[in-house]
From Swiss-Prot:
Gene symbol of the encoding locus: flaA
Any Pfam family matching the protein: Flagellin_N
Protein's name in the database: Flagellin
GO CC annotations, alphabetized: bacterial-type flagellum; extracellular region
GO MF terms, alphabetically ordered: structural molecule activity
Length: 391
């Protein structure tokens, strides 16, 4: 090697190696202090991109798991409300069976009717007021309600909660006060169709007969009247009857009809043209039947029991659906948590620091720094040897 002064090659080599060990030491300290192997894209460009995608998936799936838990909560809220509706329907059915007993007086029937009315009102209140985060989950709807729960990190990864329209179990929707009715001078409460008629009449639809067990005078008043001159006995406001029958001279019904239009109002009409004018159409008034409820006038407890059985069946079907969707959501949450765990482990292998490796690297580079500094000092002394040639 030539003896030169201007260029100290050995010093340059020592400086270069010292810079490398210093950079490596800084990288090791950064990884140890942050816990991350990749602190910037320059550390591992491909690894950084892969880890970033994993992070997006993990965060999306974590939120999806929370969404699924929200789905469980809304299903539980709805199912709990339906359970209370079912309890009320069970009690109404029990009362209806009690009312069917021939030993009941009119006063007994009225007392039963009062509790039935309150139970029906409570069913409506539960349906109207059951709320989850501002969503009226049981409010009367013309169509089924579907709630889509996002349970994945990608588009269209959803589970639908279907809540059937409640018209099958929401027996009626009454607002305001309900007018009274008069049969043979005795006031009756006209309310939920299928129950009010128990207080005064029994019907047999198949034979088209109506007997007035609590209104004998009404039947007697109709005696002697020809079918064409049929007498009308009505329940409700006398100027606005809500239910009417036409009796002949034997006290049996010749015809009656009560139908619902698309707005849920009731209109009264007669099947016999000869007496149609005497059974003029009239609106229900303040007692509105829920739209689509498919409730027709019933003259006895048997038909009311059928309606109640249909309502309880609808509630049971909806509760079964909600129970099944809860189980599905629980399975979904378990699967999401498992996926999150695996993706997090994969991301960790890419971007997290291995402390054993990094501590070893730090120790090695610290030693190299110390050695490099010492060697650089010696390399800087090499040009001094040229001075001996000048003596």
């Amino acid at each position: 090697m030539a003896a030169v002064i201007n260029t100290n090659y050995l010093s340059l080599v020592a400086q270069n190696n010292l810079n490398k060990s210093q950079s490596a030491l800084g990288s090791a300290i950064e990884r140890l202090s942050s816990g991350l192997r990749i602190n910037s894209a320059k550390d591992d460009a491909a690894g950084q991109a892969i880890a970033n995608r994993f992070t997006a998936n993990v965060k999306g799936l974590t939120q999806a798991a929370r969404n699924a838990n929200d789905g469980i909560s809304i299903a539980q809220t709805t199912e709990g409300a339906l359970n209370e509706i079912n309890n009320n329907l069970q009690r109404i059915r029990e009362l209806t069976v009690q009312a069917s007993n021939g030993t009941n007086s009119a006063s007994d029937i009225d007392s039963i009717q009062q509790e039935v009315n309150q139970r029906l009102e409570e069913i409506n209140r539960i349906a109207e007021q059951t709320d989850f985060n501002g969503i009226k989950v049981l409010k009367s709807n013309a169509t089924d309600m579907t709630l889509s729960i996002q349970v994945g990190a990608k588009d269209n990864e959803t589970i639908d909660i279907k809540i059937d329209r409640n018209s099958n179990w929401n027996l009626y929707d009454a607002v305001g006060t309900v007018p009274g009715g008069t049969v043979n001078g005795e006031a009756r409460t006209v309310n939920a169709l299928g129950f009010d008629v128990l207080s005064a009449v029994t019907t047999t639809i198949a034979s088209d007969t109506v007997t007035f067990d609590a209104a004998v005078a009404a039947a007697e008043q109709a005696a002697g009247a020809a079918v064409g001159d049929g007498s009308v006995v009505s329940y409700g406001d006398t100027a606005n009857p809500q239910y009417a029958v036409v009796v002949d001279n034997a006290g049996t019904m010749t015809s009656y009809a009560l139908t619902f239009d698309k707005d849920g109002k009731a209109a009264l009409g007669d099947q016999l043209g000869a007496v149609a004018s005497q059974a003029a159409e009239a609106a229900v008034g303040t007692n509105d039947v829920a739209a689509g409820a498919n409730v027709t006038v019933s003259g006895g407890a048997a038909d009311a029991l059928s309606k109640l059985d249909d309502a309880m069946k609808a509630v049971d079907e909806q509760r079964s659906s909600l129970g099944a969707i809860q189980n599905r959501f629980e399975s979904t949450v378990a699967n999401l948590n498992n996926t999150i765990t695996n993706l997090s482990a994969a991301r960790s292998r890419i971007e997290d620091s291995d402390y054993a490796t990094e501590v070893s690297n730090m120790t090695k580079n610290q030693i190299l720094q110390q050695a490099g500094t010492s060697v650089l000092a010696q390399a800087n002394q090499v040009p001094q040897n040229v001075l001996s040639l000048l003596r």
